[in-house]
Amino acid sequence: MSKTLTLAKKLVSIDSITPQDKGCQSIMISHLNDLNFEITDLKFGEVDNFWAIRGQQSPVFVFAGHTDVVPVGNESEWHMPPFSAQVKNGMLYGRGTSDMKGSLAAMLSATDRFVKDHSNHKGSIGYLITSDEEGPAINGTVKVAQYLKKINQTVDYCLVGEPSATHELGDIIKNGRRGSLNGSFKIIGKQGHIAYPHLASNPIHLVIPALNDLCNEVWDEGNEYFPATSFQISNIQSGTGVTNVIPGESNIVFNFRYSTQCTQEQLQSRVCAILDKRNFEYQITWEHSGYPFLTPKGKLVNACVNAIKTVKNINTQLSTSGGTSDGRFIAPILKTRVIELGPSNATIHQVNECVSIQDLEDLSDIYYHILKNILT
């Protein structure tokens, strides 16, 4: 059994449901200690994190990832126990195989091979690992990145091992992500009997024209890297549950996935301007969960594209689609180039999550060639 598969099975067999680590990081740290990495344990609250680095020179190339996984869901729907790390028909099954313990195993085996082949490599190799990516993401990567900034640790390039492939390994590299802005507002009306609307003020009727305005607004037209900013309503709540009462308030929850053409401040201002045009009282709150980031073509992107071409002989595509990742913390806090490159995302967060064993071996090979392209 290969080093990559051995490590993957060890990690997947641990039920590290977010924000628990349960020893996954100890396995990684033990492996990195053998390669003369300097390890810094960084526990914030109940979250385990670590920073590891080998070398003291630039460029600093960092692997970033997480050891926590999402809950398994209905275990009876799994073909095999979700933490048994079983192999069947060339696939490794288990929660976290694709997201993202398979990537962690590939990183470690690639690093081991690279250090043994190039013991005097230039620059430095780092690892930024957390157990708080799938949960609130409060005491994880964001805190580690802030710590690294505080100690003036530079990071020139960062590869996050999130599952990025759509149809085959290496077909997609995420070279950026949209920002995410959550909002919620309450429309204040006046409760009353539904047969006497003149004695009440229906907040649902009041808010519908404003919602139409928000849904029809063109926030921007995107650019060559990002699609147009998206506004989506995720929740509308109102009423008392009976048919004869006009509600006294209505609550709306929404989200922006926004491009680099907008800022959170601009979006907030424009939403309030649209609401202010309407004759109702409202209260609004905001939660910003991630800035957009973009890594343009250059040393890091080229190193990844060329590594994929070497191993898979395919031409990869750059994409900024999808949800947020911890890259949203690393890129702005450490002012660094970030890309995401990992296995298939076809079964992530699903029952019977699995990853191709051949893909894990090829991913390790790709990571090896990325290290070689940047640090030799």
UniProtKB/Swiss-Prot annotation:
Pfam families: M20_dimer (PF07687), Peptidase_M20 (PF01546)
Binding annotation for Zn(2+) 1: 66, 99, 162
Cofactor note: Binds 2 Zn(2+) or Co(2+) ions per subunit.
GO terms for biological process, alphabetical: diaminopimelate biosynthetic process; L-arginine biosynthetic process; lysine biosynthetic process via diaminopimelate
UniProt-listed Enzyme Commission number(s): 3.5.1.18
Presence of keyword Zinc: yes
Keyword Metal-binding attached: yes
GO molecular function: acetylornithine deacetylase activity; cobalt ion binding; succinyl-diaminopimelate desuccinylase activity; zinc ion binding
Binding site for Zn(2+) 2: 99, 134, 349
Cofactor: Zn(2+); Co(2+)
Source domain of life: Bacteria
Reaction equations catalysed: N-succinyl-(2S,6S)-2,6-diaminopimelate + H2O = (2S,6S)-2,6-diaminopimelate + succinate
InterPro entries in the record: Bact_exopeptidase_dim_dom (IPR036264), DapE_proteobac (IPR005941), Peptidase_M20 (IPR002933), Peptidase_M20_dimer (IPR011650), Peptidase_M20A (IPR050072)
UniProt-listed SUPFAM superfamilies: Bacterial exopeptidase dimerisation domain (SSF55031), Zn-dependent exopeptidases (SSF53187)
Keywords: Amino-acid biosynthesis, Cobalt, Diaminopimelate biosynthesis, Hydrolase, Lysine biosynthesis, Metal-binding, Zinc
Catalytic machinery residues: 68, 133
Listed pathway(s): Amino-acid biosynthesis; L-lysine biosynthesis via DAP pathway; LL-2,6-diaminopimelate from (S)-tetrahydrodipicolinate (succinylase route): step 3/3
Gene3D superfamilies the record matches: Zn peptidases
Biological role: Catalyzes the hydrolysis of N-succinyl-L,L-diaminopimelic acid (SDAP), forming succinate and LL-2,6-diaminopimelate (DAP), an intermediate involved in the bacterial biosynthesis of lysine and meso-diaminopimelic acid, an essential component of bacterial cell walls.
Family under the similarity heading: Belongs to the peptidase M20A family. DapE subfamily.
Oligomer and partners: Homodimer.
Protein name stated in the entry: Succinyl-diaminopimelate desuccinylase
Organism: Vesicomyosocius okutanii subsp. Calyptogena okutanii (strain HA)
